[in-house]
């Protein structure tokens, strides 16, 4: 501590190990203060504090702040990563984003910022249909969206999204050369849809490279957030992103690690991310434990949603006139879970709850 006293109060005389200072840190008067040798004897010529023989005695007479201020020693830095709960004031919550499904929004209270939602369900069970609508409803709410689709080409993705955005009124039936009845977006409506989506929906073009790694997806999302102001992200799906894993065990561990990185990205930027994951073989995604791979995938999620579209051979199809179900199997914020019947419209490729009104997106206002 000798050098700190000298630095703080100004050395006037040094005789061997004895220092005579201009200012006494005990009384702060312009008096002589002497530190004698290395034995720890503190002496002041005039103040009433008396002699202090060790640092413990000095600490007992001065507050921690006074001690560090007097010695010109910086106070210890507070440990990072620890929050005093009583004093913590959380930032005001930004607006939550609706999913567009009334029963689902009531259960989840919409989707909150910084939350990772995992969507699961069987192949051809409606997951991509569902996430496409989530993206459009986010755009309707004013968000810019970035989408990674590992299974749909850019052309097919665009066709799918345009159909969902159009709605039944602006879809016209066409007959293919093979006699199949299909549906196409009205050409005039398509112009308005393009204008509405311009600078608001971005797709990671998977035709640009043959193999897309998990790191590539995070990197592109970072760029989309920085350059295009995207705050809503969709990964469809987890299985299509390449990992460097050699075996099954390493593969599932890599998937869990990637999910953790997606969660970290979501938290850091305070955005919303939707991650599509397949269920375990033989399961339908109606339990959060059904997600294929490491258990951490569902553990990292804020919400887990199962999407199920009935096929003609589904035994549950015989019990209801619904076309499928949406099941909330995990709801970290509110704890409420539930299952809701849904309808599916083939022409528009839209899902809807039984009580939901038909959504008209804002491009129609410009019609």
Predicted regions and their residues:
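Conserved inter-motif catalytic segment of the P-loop NTP-binding fold
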Residues: 143-247
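Hydrophobic alpha-helical membrane-association signature
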Residues: 217, 254-261
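The Walker A/P-loop phosphate-binding site
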Residues: 77-169, 191
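C-terminal regions of RecA-like/P-loop NTPase motor modules
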Residues: 194, 215-230, 247-249, 264-269, ...
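Flexible beta-alpha connector loops of hexameric P-loop NTPases
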Residues: 208-211, 243-256, 285-289
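Short, well-ordered beta-strand core segments
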Residues: 145, 273, 304-306
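N-terminal structured subdomain of primase-like DNA metabolism proteins
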Residues: 1-76
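Structural recognition of the conserved hydrophobic beta-strand(s) that form the central parallel beta-sheet
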Residues: 234-235, 271-278
